[in-house]
Amino acid sequence: EKTSQRGLSRLSAGRAATLLLMVVVVFAVLAQQVRRHGFPERLPEEVARIEAVHADKHPRSRDCLDEGDDCLFGQGPMRAILIGDSHADHLLAGLLENIPEGQGSVLFRGMAACLITFDARFNQEGGERCDQMSQWLKENHRGLPAGVPLILAGAYSRYTNNSEISDSEVLFYFDERVRTFSAEYFQTFRERYVAMVCELASERPVYQVRATPILNQDV
């Protein structure tokens, strides 16, 4: 500190002011670079926000996912029915935030890695739980409170191979004879899914959440 003071004392007032201004400019430029690009090896601010949203879930939403039971969240009359897989699970907190406290509740029923579709049969070990979930909705949807909106959400692109024709074996099927991602398979799926939504919509408004993008690797 004393060495710096001795050096500065030899400068004229003009040169000292110029030096101080240069230091301020350098720090200002560096601050702008950090603000725009962040520190090396640190997640960009946009990615950090996405990560925070990923964890923004209702603390009890996992209690009902995969348990095969329906859960009522909130207080008051039922305002919405949420059905789907773990992607639907992530919507629960947002739905509840848009209902004034104490003035409504959300019925949630979900099953991870399951596309809810009437009469579908999952083509993998453990798929019975998915079949049972679809069957439950088919048999019980008319008994749910009339007029309450139904929201369907899920990782549709994963279940349907991004709608691309392929010789790969399907995750679920409707016909034993059609078990690859063929044009016939997609036509059958389209017809069955639309028929299901129309049947559900005969009792209440039905909302289909756009498919959630899935990253192929962690970031």
Pin down the residues of each PLM region:
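Extracellular/periplasmic envelope-modification machinery, especially enzymes
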Residues: 2-219
